[in-house]
């Protein structure tokens, strides 16, 4: 199976439990890693986290370090819940492929078949002579479901030359759980706004997977959360994965910190919100504070909360070709399709040695990518850095994430460099 990588974040880096002996795993390197991560916490480079390392489906290391809530002196533990942001996209992409396997859709279908509002897409093209700084062009072809899965639909996160139009429509940022509006209604309104590029011409990271989540709801007649619970989370025994954390579990939700020039800062804060009006990554108050409940607007691109152990089960299912513990979620050929590169040579992709599958970044050339493993990816989304490294040949993977900047990037590099097979 080709290597897959997931965009997104989730503060999983190493936290409080067991390093287990496993053939082909260098325990001395794991010890170095544990000491390094403890030092990162002491130095104020990380507040805390959880690292889960698995090989051949067996847990090699599952340990917590640092703080779940530094100011309240609550230590991180392996059962801490983490906001996984864009790693939610992998769940939603799998849901779409489940629906294709069941005949509910084809990924070649135009989006307008299900949401007619997307039949008249306009694209904003920079034009200094235009009053708004851009002109509108009719999209050269319809957006397909495949375009959404590969982020080649031309839909971004409401930024660029038409950013003011998106802000005026109150569609901005990457998390909508606090909204009274359903995602299906929001997706219909998105169709009326200027898009960032013509379909099939560019890789544009954006609301694509949120739209796919709304499509899952439209076709299944369920909320995205209910569909994923029934079809994915429950069968895989992912008991600690939610869109809306039950009140009795909210004490397990880890605090989010941002790396600033003054060090780690608890999020959100009034000064950051004031100093960065309309900032894309800050001001996500409901998400960052964990005030999760009430409205039921399910963000298929960034809305889930999970644990390292739960997400490891999801990854293991994919590594095994769609099956885990005798439960088949996807067909083997479907997983192969998802992890193949679907970007044509005409679509520029800024990550050397990589392509993009149906929901995942795919490593194509280890040399060009310059990674130590069969696959590894560190992706930056402003202040969010996430690395998912999978040693496919050796069936080993680690998942790490942090809220930070280039300084934090060195931490995940260190992890990728130390955890490797003999």
Residue ranges and their predicted role:
Residues 1-8:
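Bacterial N-terminal signal peptides that target proteins for export
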Residues 16-17:
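N-terminal signal peptide c-region/cleavage motif recognized by signal peptidases
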Residues 23-84, 104-106, 120-127:
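Short, conserved catalytic-motif segment at the N-terminal edge
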Residues 31, 37-38, 57, 81-111, ...:
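Active-site SXXK
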Residues 41-45, 74, 379-381, 388-391:
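Short loop/turn motifs at secondary-structure junctions and domain boundaries
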Residues 47-49, 60, 82, 376, ...:
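Short loop/turn microsegments at loop-to-beta-strand junctions
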Residues 116-374:
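Short, surface-exposed loop or secondary-structure junction motifs
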Residues 381-422:
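Structured C-terminal helix/loop/strand segments within mature extracytoplasmic catalytic/sensor domains
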């Amino acid at each position: 199976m080709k290597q897959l990588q997931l965009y997104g974040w989730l503060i999983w880096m190493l936290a409080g439990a067991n390093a287990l002996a496993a053939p082909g795993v260098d325990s001395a390197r794991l010890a170095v890693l544990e000491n390094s991560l403890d030092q990162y916490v002491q130095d104020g480079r990380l507040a805390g986290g959880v690292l889960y390392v698995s090989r051949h489906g067996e847990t090699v290391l599952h340990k917590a370090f640092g703080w779940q809530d530094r100011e309240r002196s609550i230590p991180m533990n392996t059962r801490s819940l983490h906001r996984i942001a864009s790693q939610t996209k992998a769940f939603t992409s799998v849901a779409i492929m489940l629906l294709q396997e069941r005949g509910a859709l084809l990924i070649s279908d135009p989006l307008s078949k299900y949401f007619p509002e997307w039949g008249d897409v306009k694209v904003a093209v920079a034009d200094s002579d235009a009053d708004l700084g851009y002109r509108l062009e009719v999209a050269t072809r319809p957006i397909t479901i495949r375009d959404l899965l590969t982020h080649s639909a031309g839909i971004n996160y409401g930024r660029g030359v038409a950013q003011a139009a998106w802000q005026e429509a109150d569609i901005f940022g990457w998390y909508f759980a606090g909204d009274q509006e359903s995602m299906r209604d929001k997706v219909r309104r998105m169709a009326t706004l200027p898009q960032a590029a013509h379909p099939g011409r560019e890789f544009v990271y954006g609301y694509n997977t949120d739209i796919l989540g709304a499509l899952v709801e439209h076709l299944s007649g369920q909320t995205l959360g209910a569909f994923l619970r029934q079809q994915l989370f429950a069968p895989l025994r992912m008991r600690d994965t939610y869109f809306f954390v039950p009140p009795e579990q909210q004490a397990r939700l880890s605090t989010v910190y941002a790396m600033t020039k003054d060090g780690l800062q608890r999020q959100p804060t009034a000064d950051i919100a004031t100093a960065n009006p309309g900032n894309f990554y800050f001001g996500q108050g409901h998400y960052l504070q964990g005030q999760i409940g009430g409205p039921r607007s399910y963000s298929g691109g960034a809305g889930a909360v999970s644990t390292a152990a739960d997400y490891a089960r999801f990854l293991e299912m994919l590594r095994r070709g769609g099956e885990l513990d005798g439960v088949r979620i996807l067909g083997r050929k479907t997983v192969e399709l998802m992890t193949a590169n679907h970007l044509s040579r005409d679509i520029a992709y800024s990550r050397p040695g990589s392509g993009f599958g149906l929901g995942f970044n795919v490593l194509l050339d280890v040399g060009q990518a310059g990674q130590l493993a069969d696959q590894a990816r560190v992706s930056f989304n402003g202040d969010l850095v996430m690395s998912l490294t999978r040693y496919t040949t050796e069936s080993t993977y680690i998942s790490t994430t942090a809220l930070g900047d280039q300084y934090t990037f060195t931490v995940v590099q260190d992890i990728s460099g130390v955890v490797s097979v003999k």
